[in-house]
Design a protein with these regions (language model features):
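A broad structural signal for alpha-helix termini and local helix breaks/kinks
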Residues: 64, 186-187
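Conserved helicase ATPase motor motifs in RecA-like P-loop NTPase domains
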Residues: 24-25, 161-176, 184
Length: 187
């Protein structure tokens, strides 16, 4: 890693919750993987746009030598068992689960309780969200509104995690309020 990436990793290791807001192409993914590898805060969940899931899987293998599984319908009910599996050398078979924003409800929300106002308390999460020690949220500016279900799902999943890393090249899209929900997600 470059010197500025080493500084980013050191900062994330110290703070445990941060927004990596570098411009595109400066290695936010490598910094996040470096932070997870150095901290050992596995299992980790990566939440990213659907088009980036394969990239995250490749990058974890390339930069960290870590197997990552992409959550889909075929492993929907068994992924937690895959995290417990060991290879012949005794190391975990996989330490990272990757999913996209649009699948959070399908995989991690048990029920939405009807209330007059939709809040974080309206969501009943699947207990498997507690298996993760850390969460990486790629393109975190997608969570700029505190009113959307997607932002609330991310916030609820991130609660209580040892590490919460938010990656975005544009932390503020329209106005400074865009940053507020991203900060709420960090806790």
């Amino acid at each position: 890693p470059y010197e500025y990436q080493k500084e980013g990793i050191a900062y994330a290791l110290e703070k445990k919750r941060c927004i990596m807001g570098d411009e595109m192409g400066l290695g936010k993914t490598a910094q996040a993987i470096g932070t997870m590898t150095a901290s050992g805060a596995f299992p980790a969940l990566v939440i990213c746009p659907a088009s980036l899931k394969l990239n995250w899987q490749r990058e974890f293998r390339k930069f960290g030598g870590i197997n990552a599984i992409i959550l889909d319908d075929s492993n929907r009910n068994v992924w937690q068992n895959i995290l417990r599996m060991k290879r012949a050398d005794g190391k975990p078979f996989a330490q990272v689960v990757i999913t996209n924003y649009e699948s959070l409800k399908k995989f991690f929300v048990r029920r939405l309780n009807r209330q007059e106002r939709f809040t974080l308390k309206s969501i009943e999460f699947d207990e498997r969200v507690h298996l993760f020690r850390s969460v990486i949220i790629d393109e975190s500016h997608k969570c700029k509104s505190n009113k959307t279900q997607q932002s609330k799902f991310v916030q609820g999943i991130a609660q209580g995690k040892e590490y919460v890393l938010e990656l975005t090249g544009t932390p503020v899209v329209n106005n400074n309020m865009d940053l507020l929900q991203q900060l709420n997600i960090m806790g």
